[in-house]
Amino acid sequence: MSRTARIERVTKETKVLVEIDLDGTGKADIETGVGFYDHMLHQIARHGGFDLTVHTVGDLHIDAHHTMEDAALALGAAVDRALGDRAGIRRYGAATVPMDEVLVRAAVDLSGRPYVVHDEPPLAPYIGPVYPTSMTRHIWESFGQSARITLHVDVLRAARPGGHPDAHHVVEAQFKAVSRALREATSLDPRFTGVVPSTKGTL
């Protein structure tokens, strides 16, 4: 069974195309116009093991908010569609990822119930010229809502003792941790082929 999806989201603010194959090999074709965001979406493909295309044209002459939000919404919708009825999946996934001085934990439940908890310290306002660090939480909230998942992202350590957080490392470690957790949660459990992982019988 093919676990793929294609989502096109068009508004007066953005035009987004997302294609995903949950059983891919980490290939990525990413163009959002926000360089650091492109870098983060590459992490999702590589560390999630997904083949991922994200093409976005947005109103970057205003700011990056709509572009980043709508790409996250479309990505979540693509994951939701690719999962189908969610039968046979492991459902739960968790990963703790270090990136030098930073340590991040992510936990995922493909529950069908959108809920996001995100905890990170104050960071420098921008990474690169146009990625506002305040948007990271909103990305996870938008993604979790449209993917219909429960997602917890906790920055356990943001800096070495006495140091200041490196925003690049803090955000990148989050994307890598979430990707690894998603990889586990979306993977198929051969012991329960065709079985929805819930006592309710549906997710």
UniProtKB/Swiss-Prot annotation:
Pathway(s) it belongs to: Amino-acid biosynthesis; L-histidine biosynthesis; L-histidine from 5-phospho-alpha-D-ribose 1-diphosphate: step 6/9
InterPro entries in UniProt: IGPD_sf, ImidazoleglycerolP_deHydtase, ImidazoleglycerP_deHydtase_CS, Ribosomal_Su5_D2-typ_SF
UniProt keyword annotation of Cytoplasm present: yes
Chemical reaction(s) catalysed: D-erythro-1-(imidazol-4-yl)glycerol 3-phosphate = 3-(imidazol-4-yl)-2-oxopropyl phosphate + H2O
PANTHER family referenced in this protein's UniProt entry, alphabetically: IMIDAZOLEGLYCEROL-PHOSPHATE DEHYDRATASE, IMIDAZOLEGLYCEROL-PHOSPHATE DEHYDRATASE HIS7
Any one Pfam family match given in the protein's UniProt record, by short name: IGPD
Top enzyme category: lyase
Subcellular location field: Cytoplasm
Domain of life: Bacteria
Keyword Cytoplasm: yes
EC number: 4.2.1.19
Main localization category: cytoplasm
Protein family: Belongs to the imidazoleglycerol-phosphate dehydratase family.
GO molecular function: imidazoleglycerol-phosphate dehydratase activity
Protein name per UniProt: Imidazoleglycerol-phosphate dehydratase
GO terms of biological process kind: L-histidine biosynthetic process
One GO location term (cellular component): cytoplasm
UniProt keyword terms in alphabetical order: Amino-acid biosynthesis, Cytoplasm, Histidine biosynthesis, Lyase
